[in-house]
Amino acid sequence: MNTFKTIALLLVGTVSSLMLMGCGEIDTGTETSAWEKETATIVPEEPETEIILGDIGGASTLQEAVADFNGKNNGITIIIHDYYEENISDGISRLYDDILTGKGPDIISFSTDEMDVEVLREKGAIENLIPYLEKSDVIGEEDIVDSAYQVLTADGGLYMLPTNFVLYTLITKEKWCSNKENFTFEEALRAVRECEEDPMISRDLFLQEGAICGGYSGETEDNRLEQYIKIAEQLPQQAMFQTNDLLMREGKIPFNLECIGDMQQYLYKKSVWGEDAVYTGFPGAEGKGRIFIFDNCFAINSQSTHKEEAWKFVESYFTEEGQKTIAPNWNFSILQDVLDQQLSDSRKQEYYQTSDGKREKLPILTYEIGSTYENVYAAQDEDIQDVREMINNTKVMQRSDLPLIGITQAEALYYFNGEKSIEETAAAIRNKIDEMPNAKNAQPDMDVIINIGDFSVSLYAVSYTHLRAHETRRHL
């Protein structure tokens, strides 16, 4: 169509020129006419490469990144396919279906609190990105925060590349946790039993995150399972939203699960809980009991015919310009040098001059607690060191495909309702785990939004039965 338009415009232009010159001046000899000279140089345009990017929710930042990429790359057009319709869990199910049936998309965009790529990795549906890193001039293995990279490559390959992350961590008081490096079962149980107010974390969430970070298992010799259930018994069935921050400061709430994505969040929660606040992890867990939630993650479909072009888009987030314009760096960056700068910037204290000439610190935020207002100021060296240690010691990431979670949550209800003893409950959980030879590949049904403190975390997964049904359809 573009070629015909070009010829038509040239023809109109040539005829107009002839009319201006006069018909008597037309050369009827054997020389090549002007029109023939012009049309001889026309070359058909190369068709554009269309890349489909599958997303759930269509974040404005992603749309901006795609628009920026399309504007800078001739011949490549990325089109966003938003799988979200009536709810996120159905959207995730459709996305899994399209990937596993070979329909696409070329690029998958997600967060690890939305979906889990483990099933896709095991089925060979997504690319190992290590070879792409090895030949990239933009980002390499050495550029990524080491603890995060070790978690991302725990299975021997890199099947998703996030741009940012946040940390799940518990926060409590020194009187409940004497050593932040090890929140013991005895301390946690004493805290939930002796506190005047209910914790804000629910039973299901405590059991879920405890399983994810390796706080307990279904192994026969692992008695941590019973201890987690005993602690969960003291927790509310539903997550509590507490508006009275004084209860935290006064130690009347045992602990809470916090999502720390930058130094300001860290400093704010530490201030609310008071000078004796302690950031710690889940009892008995790996990596000091904390969890990575990777954000703005990208995976490449192994059946895509445009893998290099897809990688070029993913890579654009990690250029110097991309880090300044499209990467959501309000959360911790996955790039070590950018993270270092984020932490360093948080210690910069600004000042202002009062009307009487005094130089005063400018707070980074002010909040109300009780009937007073309190200020939070720039980070101190010990704050930055604490956050560095939290990041460096984290060894697991948010997952939703562990069968242990759903089984434990379901069976523990019998104990909570007084229908089974703790021994009977633990035995039932272990038996069900043992009955699942492919338990690692199975996923529990989860479609919940759990409110945690003053933020919400969405936790979704495709059900085991759905994946099994899909696997059956593939082989028909």
In which residue ranges do the predicted regions lie?
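C-terminal motif of bacterial Sec signal peptides marking the signal peptidase cleavage site
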Residues: 21-22
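Mature extracytoplasmic/periplasmic domains
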Residues: 45, 296-399, 423
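Early extracytoplasmic/lumenal segment of secretory-pathway proteins
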Residues: 46-115, 246
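Short helices/loops that flank or line small-molecule/ion binding pockets
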Residues: 89-104, 108, 118, 242-264, ...
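Hinge/lid segment of periplasmic solute-binding proteins
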Residues: 111-169, 276-283
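Helix-loop-helix "hinge/cap" segment bordering the ligand-binding cleft or interdomain interface
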Residues: 130-136, 149-244, 302-308, 421
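Extracytoplasmic/periplasmic substrate-binding proteins
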Residues: 235-312, 333
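Conserved small/polar residues in nucleotide/adenosyl-binding loops
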Residues: 462-472
